[in-house]
Amino acid sequence: MTTDTARRHTGAERANEMTYEQLARELLLVGPAPTNEDLKLRYLDVLIDNGLNPPGPPKRILIVGAGIAGLVAGDLLTRAGHDVTILEANANRVGGRIKTFHAKKGEPSPFADPAQYAEAGAMRLPSFHPLTLALIDKLGLKRRLFFNVDIDPQTGNQDAPVPPVFYKSFKDGKTWTNGAPSPEFKEPDKRNHTWIRTNREQVRRAQYATDPSSINEGFHLTGCETRLTVSDMVNQALEPVRDYYSVKQDDGTRVNKPFKEWLAGWADVVRDFDGYSMGRFLREYAEFSDEAVEAIGTIENMTSRLHLAFFHSFLGRSDIDPRATYWEIEGGSRMLPETLAKDLRDQIVMGQRMVRLEYYDPGRDGHHGELTGPGGPAVAIQTVPEGEPYAATQTWTGDLAIVTIPFSSLRFVKVTPPFSYKKRRAVIETHYDQATKVLLEFSRRWWEFTEADWKRELDAIAPGLYDYYQQWGEDDAEAALALPQSVRNLPTGLLGAHPSVDESRIGEEQVEYYRNSELRGGVRPATNAYGGGSTTDNPNRFMYYPSHPVPGTQGGVVLAAYSWSDDAARWDSFDDAERYGYALENLQSVHGRRIEVFYTGAGQTQSWLRDPYACGEAAVYTPHQMTAFHLDVVRPEGPVYFAGEHVSLKHAWIEGAVETAVRAAIAVNEAPVGDTGVTAAAGRRGAAAATEPMREEALTS
């Protein structure tokens, strides 16, 4: 190797090492050396305590997207005195991928009981996401426990004030909290009554934890693998990775290494594992058998994401942890964006989709566009009304912009001048995953029932109906004879047969599917679960039961099918109406056919890939993408800044969107007044104040 070649190799290695360290800082929210500021503490101060520092002259700021990132940034900047306009493509609601199905004034209720609601998107908030939780508290919203694992309702004390948000910094152990402790608050005990059903074997989670052999043998596992739960397998495989940055104590808990080693350890994790998919890690690094990988993928919900980056599943393993505490917002997750939006009525413009973005960056070859340039606006955004892609455009101008829409959606926006090469690559290549939910409403919370509850409710429909559902192995003719005479001629059969159901609401399509379905359903024990979820290898994959009843109601909405990636793609092939019959049938395979009597015929479904504004559930990198371009995702392009979950390394979480929104707001607030036409807003609020919006045909870049 020549001296020049060696130098080039050394230079490339140094550049790579700097990339790994910077990515570790992004992940951990560590500021630049030498101060190594804890950015989370700073963001908490800005978001919750003191707001942005007083700015210089107010700036005209355009924000694209009224999801949680756009709303948080808009709120901070408006309170700081800037002239903010938030452009939202959706004409009907704010919130982006925070969406709750609920009754709206003047519109048909999504469920038979208008009091019911259910989440189409974000549904749980972990205790280690302090920005989101503290914001919820600051806005006066009520948070309550979300039960990732079902609980014993006779234990704990949830009626006491909820504990405050608490964060302990990696710097000098400094702490932040937003209230006094609440020692009276107690979480209920976990029961693990919910189900795992795979390969026609079904056990409760509690049984699987003590004896996983029957489930594991269904995947053809042998030897010691049959005696380990898949969760234990994965944890054992990940222990060497955790050793990079933390130390295991005698009691099994882990503590972070001293700061420099902790940061360097995470940089080494990025270096050594960003090139792995989760499937490759389990097979090559952990040396699991193919059968073990299949079991892990099915039960731990990794199957459809085994081809995606190791890092996403590794971080998600910490984020969706059965031992962690999770919260939800009473009234639905929608309460968070809607509450923020109330104070931004004058700033939000609904039903305006960005189709063209032009900006002036004096650092780029003196380029100026048709609408931007020296002495004029630095940013011009052109929009069309929702549902009118070929309409004449409306132009909005400003000094700076924050783009919060997903890159999957930004891909369809004309940008002049083009972003830098690495940014364009990130916009083009960032992998967006799929997620699809199917929700079904029932007039009684049968998942909480004991067998005594089942007998009471079924025999209230017709004496002997409980015994009918308990019969097993009969052919259809025998089953028909066993059916009580009083319910043989119901117009919908036993679908929605309970008196609490208005069977006239059950659509003919669903009734026809029900009549022609060969599934009679097995006999299954009462689930008797409060919250939590079950797992199956049928297309529904994951099922979640409500953590809390809606006050004054006896029914509830079950998340009957929750799937990601390729699993979600199968559901996306069906029309919405078709999904309900399949979801009910697959729910019955786990819980027994008798649940049909409480089905109201009402359901809702959400495919985020088919959503025209989201174009996918969330950014989920493939191997190498994080090291290839994530640092370029974060960087602004002249006067254009970026925020959203995809700009963070907390992909798919509200916390990632919030932290990037605060960061973008700080940067825009502190941006110097340069040769970009920054002017004080005059007259009315809104970034179009200094330049009246004009109508014109869409320009090409």
Curated annotation (Swiss-Prot):
One of its GO terms (molecular function) is L-amino-acid oxidase activity. Changing R305D: Strong decrease in L-glutamate oxidation. Changes substrate specificity, the mutant can use L-arginine, L-histidine, L-phenylalanine and L-leucine. InterPro entries: Amino_oxidase (IPR002937), FAD/NAD-bd_sf (IPR036188), Flavin_monoamine_oxidase (IPR050281). Produced as a single polypeptide precursor and is activated by proteolytic cleavage. The LGOX precursor is an active enzyme, but it exhibits lower catalytic efficiency and lower thermostability compared with the mature hexameric LGOX. The mature form is strongly inhibited by p-chloromercuribenzoate, but not by CuCl(2), EDTA and diethyldithiocarbamate. Its main location: secreted. It is found in: Secreted. Optimum pH is 7.0-8.0 for mature LGOX. Optimum pH is 7.0 for recombinant LGOX expressed in E.coli. Keywords: FAD, Flavoprotein, Nucleotide-binding, Oxidoreductase, Secreted, Signal, Zymogen. Catalyzes the oxidative deamination of L-glutamate to 2-ketoglutarate along with the production of ammonia and hydrogen peroxide. Shows strict substrate specificity for L-glutamate, and exhibits only very weak activity with L-aspartate. This is L-glutamate oxidase precursor.
